[in-house]
């Protein structure tokens, strides 16, 4: 919100031929948060996201928390068995998934004992596998943005120790283990990186670290603090 207020017309994100300003990113996050609540998300419930490093994945790093939810990003390289286990363990209320991964997600849905969640399709027109895939959701991501209220009054967490995200190991040594991050930890991670990297205001960051790995090491939040420019690569 601070970056939106101070630097609304600075570029926030570039992905192929798509470019956003910070005022546009903030507006989309507000609308996404509102849309998530409108389709049933309640405080403390999990939103699972299976997507590559795209603008939608970046927006989810902020919007899910703004809606009071807990973000669960899943490794896009996992097999259907492992994804099904994560569905059962995390019990998400909503799944946001890139249609480029619909095949493995569909297999996971058939195997999972827990599928009581709404599915939102991210259709990436710049990626052939995503653009040509068959949607599996009740809404598209852009429909959810349109459903959202641009004047949505998002709330800060009641407590700094409230959960902000739920991350899982990849299960290489057995079943995946879930780890809950809190808002305080996410804030300190983002703030601590700035002096450690000797970062200045308005940096440009090529996002090569997958955002499903520890929320991209918190760099999305760091770039929000610094009003930087993120370049996404799928």
What is each PLM-predicted segment?
Residues 121, 133-168, 175, 198-204:
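Conserved pre-ATP/AMP-binding loop-to-beta segment of ANL
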């Amino acid at each position: 919100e601070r970056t939106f207020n101070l630097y609304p017309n600075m570029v926030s994100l570039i992905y192929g031929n798509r470019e956003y300003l910070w005022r546009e990113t903030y507006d989309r996050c507000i609308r996404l948060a509102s849309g998530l609540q409108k389709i049933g998300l309640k405080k403390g419930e999990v939103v699972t996201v299976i997507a590559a490093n795209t603008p939608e994945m970046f927006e989810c790093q902020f919007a899910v928390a703004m809606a009071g939810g807990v973000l669960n990003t899943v490794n896009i390289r996992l097999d259907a068995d492992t994804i099904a286990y994560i569905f059962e363990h995390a019990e998400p209320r909503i799944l946001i998934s890139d249609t480029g991964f619909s095949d493995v997600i569909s297999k996971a849905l058939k195997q999972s004992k827990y599928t009581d969640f709404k599915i939102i399709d991210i259709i990436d027109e710049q990626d052939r596998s995503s653009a040509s895939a068959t949607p599996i959701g009740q809404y598209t991501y852009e429909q959810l943005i349109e459903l959202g209220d641009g004047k949505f009054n998002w709330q800060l967490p009641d407590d700094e120790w409230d959960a902000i995200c739920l991350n899982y190991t990849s299960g290489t040594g057995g079943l995946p283990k879930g780890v809950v991050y809190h808002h305080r930890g996410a804030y300190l991670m983002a703030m601590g990186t700035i002096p450690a990297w000797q970062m200045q205001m308005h940096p440009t960051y090529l996002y090569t670290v997958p955002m499903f790995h520890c929320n991209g090491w918190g760099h999305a939040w760091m770039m929000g603090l610094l009003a930087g420019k993120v370049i996404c690569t799928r």
